Amino acid sequence: MDIGLQMVFTGYGWKEISDQQVWDEELKIAEIAADSGFDCLWAVEHHFRDYAFCPDNLQLMAYLTAKHPEIDVGTAAVILPWQDPLRVAEKASALDQLSNGRLRLGVGRGLARREFDGFRTTMAESRERFDEAAAMIMESLRSGWMESEGPHYIQPKVEIRPRPRFPIDGRIYAVASSEDSVVSAAKLRARMVMFADRPWPKRLPQIQQHAQLFEEMHGVPGPPPLTADFCVCTSTMDGAEEFSREYMGTFVYSNFEHYELLGDHFSKVKGYDSYAAKIEVAKEVGIEGIIDGFMQAAVWGTPDRILREFEKRRAIIGDFELATSFRFGGTPYEVAEKSIKLFAKEVLPVLKSWKEPEAKQAAE
């Protein structure tokens, strides 16, 4: 099984924490992951607010690939409607050169109105821009050339330099939290990325849809998804549920605040109507109900309990890759460090013994 670290770069939930401390703590945890046998370092792209602030994950990965030469690096994800497709392709190709093919390129379309406003763009165009830009980028990393006649991106034919050296297929990831994003991921030949934020039986239809579409479009089995997780690993169960709920609950609150999830704007924006329906459900169950669902999806407690939860997940959704975060929702650094070290000692070796999915090999 492939296990990565998810780097969130969040300051929400801590009192009087500086941006420097946020970054220092994330980089320390990344070093532990790299030294402990994790397979990949993943980083988000977010801007402007305490929720998360990693404005250029490709730039970050250029640093991490030099500092940690034995581990893959990944973007989860580059938000394409805020980018120029040519610049993304060039930076990805350059990073692949520096890392000798260790880049995993994850892409997404964005959800926070505040971030779209900051980049002087509109959520209403995000689906079209994502689909157009993603196709341009992936094709250019296959062929070495980029050209497009729009409608959103008019790009004269240019060569990608440094020329792509390594096949990109098998290393493409796409965030898929809505039904149309599942279709887009399948078209891209991308592994689907989904967050551990609701009970896994509710995720199964999307996973099955992606697998079916992938095989119909490309003639090979679709790769298992990457689940982006949140973890609190403890030596005993004494108090584990209480403080796990504290940190995970704070992270849930940060999502509601950052994404304005109780607002009515999703129903008015093209391409986000599926979120409006989910928000109505959220209003019915309330914030505590949402936290309950998050706690069911994420993993917490002793290594034995965490392994049992992963086994239950695999029984529901099948094989999956993992990218888990240990620092979120006000988690003190000492707690996050103990958590990842115990996870690396007791959980990681067992997960790595799980057989690698045949679908992954076929996709590559």
Please report, for each region that a protein language model flagged, where it lies by residue.
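Short, acidic/polar
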Residues: 20-32, 176-183, 305-312
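Active-site mouth loops of central-metabolism enzymes
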Residues: 9-24, 78-86, 166-176, 294-303
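Hydrophobic faces of well-ordered beta-strands that scaffold small-molecule active sites
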Residues: 3-7, 41-43, 73-76, 103-107, ...
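Internal, glycine-rich beta/alpha segment that forms the wall or movable "lid"
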Residues: 1, 84-190, 201-219, 362
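An alpha-helical appendage that flanks or caps ligand/catalytic pockets
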Residues: 5-7, 35, 124-161, 201-319, ...
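Glycine-rich, proline-tolerant flexible connector loops at the mouths of alpha/beta enzymes
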Residues: 40-61, 79, 197-200, 325-336
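N-terminal beta1-alpha1-beta2 module of alpha/beta enzyme domains
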Residues: 1-73, 168-170, 361-364
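Conserved, mostly hydrophobic/aromatic
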Residues: 37, 45, 64, 95, ...
